[in-house]
């Protein structure tokens, strides 16, 4: 009889092993066997919990997305109600420590690539994209006319993704300060009174 709570402990252990495997070997080098080896368990147990490699990647991305959404909630809770502060909080969440470790960044890159081919991952990516846009649009709408708010939200979402992508591909530590400064300067520019 399995121990109470063992399922969640085992799943977390396997997700961590997946993140490490993608970090060290890339998605193509990550197999159920390589994850099992890193977790020091049998391949059969990995199959039992996730079915196949796609199921494992989906569960890993759901974990990373939950971390992102939790970071967004944390940063927004700490911000004032002013749109500028709330927008900066959403930006900060996207560059939160939970999102910029090498294993997580490499997993995001693998996820983006696979989401073009795998419907389940595409749906997850769509949910994430819509959530970011919705959060940004809601805050911009407090300070800008509707059409400008939508345009500003699209622009800031693209900037966040672009800064994150460049940082992930830079090959060194992620420069959070520089990314935050660029994104926050863009927010200031968008919210500046027009002449």
From Swiss-Prot:
A Gene Ontology biological process noted in the UniProt record is:
negative regulation of DNA-templated transcription
Q: Which ranges does the entry annotate as DNA-binding region?
A: 31-50
Q: Which chain positions lie within coiled-coil regions?
A: none
Ranges where the HTH tetR-type domain occurs = 8-68
Query: Which GO molecular function annotation, any one, does this entry have?
Result: transcription cis-regulatory region binding
**Record-linked InterPro entries:** BetI_C (IPR039538), DNA-bd_HTH_TetR-type_CS (IPR023772), Homeodomain-like_sf (IPR009057), HTH-type_TetR-like_transc_reg (IPR050109), HTH_TetR (IPR001647), Tet_transcr_reg_TetR-rel_C_sf (IPR036271), Tscrpt_rep_BetI (IPR017757)
Alphabetically ordered keywords of this record: DNA-binding, Repressor, Transcription, Transcription regulation
Q: Does the keyword Repressor apply?
A: yes
Pathway noted in the entry: Amine and polyamine biosynthesis; betaine biosynthesis via choline pathway [regulation]
Q: What Pfam families does the annotation carry?
A: TetR_C_6, TetR_N
Q: Looking at the keywords, is Transcription present?
A: yes
Relate the protein's function as given in its record: Repressor involved in the biosynthesis of the osmoprotectant glycine betaine. It represses transcription of the choline transporter BetT and the genes of BetAB involved in the synthesis of glycine betaine.
Name the PANTHER family for this protein: HTH-TYPE TRANSCRIPTIONAL REGULATOR BETI (PTHR30055:SF234), HTH-TYPE TRANSCRIPTIONAL REGULATOR RUTR (PTHR30055)
Q: List the protein's name.
A: HTH-type transcriptional regulator BetI
Q: Which gene encodes it?
A: betI
């Amino acid at each position: 009889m399995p121990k109470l709570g063992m399922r969640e402990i085992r799943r977390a252990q396997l997700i961590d092993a997946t993140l490490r495997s993608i970090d060290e070997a890339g998605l193509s080098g990550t197999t159920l066997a390589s994850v099992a080896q890193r977790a020091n368990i049998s391949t059969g147990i990995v199959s039992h919990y996730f079915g196949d490699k796609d199921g494992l990647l989906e569960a890993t991305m759901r974990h990373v997305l939950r971390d992102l959404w939790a970071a967004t909630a944390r940063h927004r809770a700490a911000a004032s109600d002013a749109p500028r502060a709330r927008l900066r909080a959403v930006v900060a969440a996207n560059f939160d420590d939970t999102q910029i470790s090498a294993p997580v960044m490499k997993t995001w890159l693998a996820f983006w690539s696979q989401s073009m081919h795998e419907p389940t991952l595409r749906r997850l990516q769509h949910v994430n994209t819509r959530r970011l846009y919705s959060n940004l649009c809601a805050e911009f709408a407090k300070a800008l006319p509707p059409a400008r708010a939508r345009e500003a939200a699209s622009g800031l979402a693209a900037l966040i993704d672009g800064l994150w992508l460049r940082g992930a591909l830079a090959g060194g530590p992620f420069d959070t300060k520089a990314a935050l400064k660029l994104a926050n300067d863009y927010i200031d520019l968008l919210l500046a009174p027009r002449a």
